Amino acid sequence: MQKKVTIYTDGACSGNPGKGGWGALLMFGSVKRELSGYSPATTNNRMELMAAIQALEALKEPCEVALYSDSSYLVNAINKGWLKRWTSNNWKTAAKKPVENIDLWKMILELIRLHSVTFHKVKGHSDNEFNNRCDYLATQAIKNNR
């Protein structure tokens, strides 16, 4: 039986593009682990994806994951089938344009094959303490350049 892990993620960017940070909170039972990182030149969407990637990569074995994000870009790509269509269309959007952030989407595809992941949308900058913590981690990563 797989471990059940809850993950919250967030990305932030100072300017878009600009300096970016991401934060993640992993919870298994009473154990909590915080992760964060920084990029000197990026976009908000890349940081949202990177938060999910780094959180899923931190898992040491296949897990059942509930991943919560305030990123419509991330959650809708999975839940509305955009990612499947992009891969079927040779990484082209419905408008026949190249999909942005292909490198990161390919990493997410690999990770969701390893784990059983459900993606959930949460409202950003509201009263969700876990999402707010991830936002804090992401903005601190930008502030501290790490």
Curated annotation (Swiss-Prot):
GO molecular function: magnesium ion binding; nucleic acid binding; RNA-DNA hybrid ribonuclease activity
Entry's Gene Ontology BP terms: DNA replication, removal of RNA primer
EC number: 3.1.26.4
Protein's UniProt keywords contain Chaperone: no
Location(s), subcellular: Cytoplasm
Binding site for Mg(2+) 1: 10, 48, 70
Manner of cofactor binding, per the entry note: Binds 1 Mg(2+) ion per subunit. May bind a second metal ion at a regulatory site, or after substrate binding.
The protein's required cofactors: Mg(2+)
Catalytic activity: Endonucleolytic cleavage to 5'-phosphomonoester
Alphabetically ordered keywords of this record: Cytoplasm, Endonuclease, Hydrolase, Magnesium, Metal-binding, Nuclease
Stretches assigned to the RNase H type-1 domain: 1-143
Database matches in PROSITE patterns: RNASE_H_1
Residues given in the record as Mg(2+) 2 binding sites: 10, 135
Gene Ontology terms: cellular component: cytoplasm
EC category: hydrolase
Primary residence: cytoplasm
Alphabetical list of PANTHER family matching this protein: RIBONUCLEASE H1
Subunit structure: Monomer.
Protein name, entry field: Ribonuclease H
Organism placement in taxonomy: Bacteria, Pseudomonadati, Chlorobiota, Chlorobiia, Chlorobiales
